[in-house]
Amino acid sequence: MARMLLGDVNVDRIEVASARVSEGEKDAVRMICRYAESVGKLDRVEVLGFVDGHKSIDWIDECGCRVLNLLAKGSLKHCTHQLKKTPEEHIDDIYRSLAYAAQKNMLVNLYLEDWSSGMKDSPDYVFQMMDALVESGIKRFLLPDTLGILNPIQVLEYLGKMKERYPSTHFDFHAHNDYDLAVGNSLAAVKAGVSGLHVTVNGLGERCGNAPLASVQAILRDQLHVDTGIREDRLGEISRLVEGYSGIAIAPNQPIVGENVFTQVAGVHADGDNKDNLYCNDLVPERFGRKREYALGKNSGKANIARNLEELGLELTPEQTRRVTQRITELGDRKEMVTQDDLPFIVSDVLKYS
């Protein structure tokens, strides 16, 4: 998957693991880093680490990874309740981690975990952290909506404040989908001026997941005219690969990658496609390595049937087409599934008794 994401799909960066999880995870990260180094892409592989003295940094260094995504606290409550430290103590700990990472020749990005709650409840703490760290050599500040609590209006407001106060700083936005707003919030983040977005294949992630790669890519290209360099024709393939390895099925109606999203059911839509593509938008299936299909059922109509017959190389008279359509409608009324593979047998049966 790492090879395909970095090579075929051409994402900018991949965060592949959390430090100190297991020996199996460590072996996997080593393999990914060896591959990435062999193709000159080691700087695009990142590992999540913690403010835990030297432990995470040593673990990541032993894997051969050169980019640390350091997890710090982005809300006062997280700092004082979870770490049981003052902001000043936490900042000192971060600086010690930065110094040790520099000794290991490691690039550091910084997560401000629970940043969204921090901006709502303790913005002075967020700005205290940023003021202390903005000139520290951290390459990117990663701003997560950890609990998925923001809406696009709030994203514009809070990120606008960050960009206004720190205009030359590279910010990434990391959305969670608890309110089904991860994609919308990611769009708002780009409008607010962030430089990077965190997405996952199929939207997989904690709880309700994160913003899905395919959906965000389509919006960036079509709505904001942003060229990300992503190979859209490989998105369907990586989606199926992740579905298989994760065991988490893709919803049939999930935009871009779902099984049914390029299937026309209503006959009037198929008829419109035959007449100057009246029911098509910019999300054409070929763009994503897919093809349009026309469902067979009681709502199909003659246009859908004709499309499927044409794909199979079958030619029927108007009367024969009418009878085939009638038979498919009858099967649909009985809730029976009709596929294109069934169509030759239905045609044969109709012709036999006509």
Describe the function of each predicted region.
Residues S18-A19, F50-D52, A72-S75, E113-W115, ...:
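Short, ordered loop/turn segments at secondary-structure junctions
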Residues I14-S18, R44-V47, L142, D172-H174:
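Short catalytic-loop micro-motif centered on adjacent basic/acidic residues
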Residues R20-G40, V45-L48, D52-I57:
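N-terminal active-site wall of soluble small-molecule enzyme domains
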Residues M1, G24-A28, S56, E89-D93, ...:
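General structural feature for long, well-ordered alpha-helical segments within catalytic domains
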Residues H225-S354:
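A mid-to-C-terminal "edge-of-domain" accessory segment
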Residues L147-L150, E157-K275, Y279-N281:
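Catalytic alpha/beta core domains of metabolic enzymes, predominantly
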